[in-house]
Amino acid sequence: MVKQENIRNFCIIAHIDHGKSTLADRILELTQVVSQREARQQYLDRMDLERERGITIKAQTVRIPYIAADGQEYELNLIDTPGHVDFNYEVSRSLAACEGALLVVDATQGVEAQTLANVYLALDHDHEVIPVLNKIDLPSAEVDRVKAEIEESIGLDCSQALPVSAKTGMGVDAVLEAIVHHLPAPKGDRAAPLKALIFDSWYDSYQGVVVLFRIMDGSVRKGDTVRLMSTGKEYEVLRLGVFSPEPTDVKELFAGEVGFLCGSIKELGDARVGDTITHADRPAETAVPGFKEVKAMVFCGLYPTESEDYENLKAALEKLQLNDAAFSYEPETSQALGFGFRCGFLGLLHMEIIQERLEREFEVGLIATAPSVVYKVVTMDGKTLEIDNPSHLPDPTKIDTLYEPYVSMDIHVPNEYVGNVMKLCEEKRGTQKNLHYLAANRVVVTYELPFAEIVYDFFDRLKSATRGYASMDYHPLDYRASDLVRLDIMLNSEPVDALAVIVHRDRAYTYGRGLALKLKRTIPRQLFQVAIQAAIGQKIIARETVSAFRKDVTAKCYGGDISRKRKLLEKQKEGKRRMKRMGNVELPQEAFLAALKVGDE
């Protein structure tokens, strides 16, 4: 057993593509935890999707035995955290499980938005942060400029910053020595009652829920009965172990150590990230602070393309929810799309990942409706409602005030694109709060924007306005009263609930015009005329018409009486009228995509 003062728990903070997973790979190889033969790129990113997108979605841990230059044996626990804003709560819990962090910055790129967001989280936890400059083997690396940027934006002393190249392995041994000498050992009393923080959990079909935890005080043995403090439920520890990096069973874990346990926990909701584990017979007095319920921020409807796939989609969503407590869903029906589900997500990346996993891992064809956020409605009789589906918005005459969520957004951008960014944010109803120069050619612009405005296409448009150079980070602020209306789309006077959206009154007309035009281009022509109308309440604000195919019914009449032709034309007209009354318009998937792309042109 390693002494407590020789344990180091650390995580690696970096923006996407700055080399976090590569550095982790090198550390594992250098300490011979993973042999060269078993090594694969991004060893800790287990999901194919994580590897492909180059992002970390779930936290992973690995125990690394390390003999330092002074001959002492240390136990290093690397906790690999997600880097994206959507998973901010998971990051904050992973950081709470460590005492220090390596801040990896790409020496060719400099400080980016998500690096900053996560560093501030680490500093909130009073972490010791070691700056590491990666990719110094590239000719475009500017070490001094990036050091100055880190000092300017974060206020970290970079005189001791470590230059490394995670790709070639250069300088990685110095990183290990720095972890041992600069990061503090975990505090915690091994004799006190057990108190352990859950920082990740997932579902295993053989063992039930597997819980990753860090012991703050006390110790836990296999066979103990433990209690989860937020729910009060009790479980027997059937399996206890550590990842090094494959799961290895151990008999006992002590304060300061990181490990996993299985205890026939059936549902992921019972072992929530951020909860505290304690002994049933000798409980801790207080829980680890900072636990909160994760709430979905973005909602959208998911429907199977083939109605017989409904059961498959339901089973797939159940499986995904086992591994993702932040994802929620409930059944809903739409007149246009049939049976489906209303799903809640942490943010846009989370939504994209879930949709991609459904299509890839479960092979379910999907139609996704336009994403929406949660609005608060105060009705005339004083009730407050939370609305996540535009078609559930009450009648405008019954609404007293409508509130929408706002976010604060930091955008890092080279100064030649600041004008484009400001123009985009103004267009999205943003208010500028701050503009701050990081270096001579890098600016941080802070805006407050309605969350609904960034849900659609903000990120894509930001990237195209700055040629891909901007990076952004946002966090929720509060709810503010806004002049919002529900825009309904009607086909032949029948409202299509799946296309309803909530928009600001000033933008309703242009949005309605744009959407009607897009739909005109995407809805295939029928044998009867299709009228596309955009309406606010009873008032029609835009209309487009998809003209009908026309069969030449008089082609076979040569000469002869005009009344014969007229009779055939009247018969055709009557048939079309009946068809229009009876017929329904099939909406292709492109029609729903069109709703997301209004305003692109």
Curated annotation (Swiss-Prot):
Key words, A-Z: Cell inner membrane, Cell membrane, GTP-binding, Hydrolase, Membrane, Nucleotide-binding, Protein biosynthesis
GO cellular component, one term: plasma membrane
PROSITE patterns tied to this protein: G_TR_1 (PS00301), G_TR_2 (PS51722)
GO function terms (MF aspect): GTP binding; GTPase activity; ribosome binding; translation elongation factor activity
Catalytic activity, reaction form: GTP + H2O = GDP + phosphate + H(+)
Keyword check for Membrane: yes
Domain tr-type G: 5-187
EC number(s) recorded for this UniProt protein: 3.6.5.n1
InterPro entries: EF-4 (IPR006297), EFG_III/V (IPR035647), EFG_V-like (IPR000640), EFTu-like_2 (IPR004161), G_TR_CS (IPR031157), LepA_C_sf (IPR038363), LepA_CTD (IPR013842), LepA_IV (IPR035654)
Membrane topology: Peripheral membrane protein
The keyword Cell inner membrane is annotated on this UniProt entry: yes
Main location per the UniProt record: membrane
GO terms of biological process kind: positive regulation of translation
Binding-site residues for GTP, renumbered to this chain: 17-22, 134-137
Subcellular location: Cell inner membrane
Family note: Belongs to the TRAFAC class translation factor GTPase superfamily. Classic translation factor GTPase family. LepA subfamily.
Known role: Required for accurate and efficient protein synthesis under certain stress conditions. May act as a fidelity factor of the translation reaction, by catalyzing a one-codon backward translocation of tRNAs on improperly translocated ribosomes. Back-translocation proceeds from a post-translocation (POST) complex to a pre-translocation (PRE) complex, thus giving elongation factor G a second chance to translocate the tRNAs correctly. Binds to ribosomes in a GTP-dependent manner.
Protein name: Elongation factor 4
